[in-house]
Amino acid sequence: MKHIVLLGDSIFDNRSYVNPNELDVPNQLRSLVGRDFKVTNLAVDGHVTRHIHNQLNNLPSDATHLFISVGGNDGLGHLSIFNQPIETIGEALQKMYLIGEKFKKVYSSMLDNVLTHDLPTSVCNIYYPRFYSNSLDRVYSYLRMGVNVVKLQQMAMAAETIFNDIIMFEVFKRNLPLIDLRIL
């Protein structure tokens, strides 16, 4: 029997984000793969890239395939930069570059750690945020009151490209398959 293991954040641990009559991602996957596959969800809502190491500590010994979706919460952790004063666009780009460099080190290390398990591994990038259609409760602590949701959406999508570029570079550098969540 094949055994799929999901690692990451709320992309896979999304029970609290779906309606009671809807299937979460692990159960959708179970319904698609049938009885020939076992599905284990080690993903945890709120986790960031550095938490994957802890999730791997619980990797079942019979795991045959890994799927990773992480990085969005790493980006959310930097939303406060949107409120920092800057003098030039160049200065803003440099700040984003430095955030990206830190993320790249953590993400690259995480992938190397995952690959030590010698299992077929597929990776998801970060989907576009949808602040305009969801509650802003998760992000209010990062932003000043009275935020314009349209501007927040635009800024987050622009900043997200840095994280997704790093994810895609690190994934393709290792010849791993990528699932682009932006088009789903």
Give the ranges of each region predicted by the language model:
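Oxyanion-hole/transition-state-stabilizing segment in secreted/luminal serine hydrolases
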Residues: 51-100, 128-129
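Substrate-gating cap/lid alpha-helix
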Residues: 131-179
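A short acidic, glycine-rich active-site loop
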Residues: 14, 89-104, 146-162
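Serine-esterase "nucleophile elbow" of acetyl-processing enzymes
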Residues: 1-45, 57-62
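Short amphipathic alpha-helices and their capping/turn segments at secondary-structure boundaries
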Residues: 1, 50-66, 106-118, 169
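Helix C-cap/helix->beta junction micro-motif
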Residues: 33, 117, 173-174
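Short, well-ordered beta-to-alpha junction loops that form the rim of enzyme active sites
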Residues: 124-128, 181-183
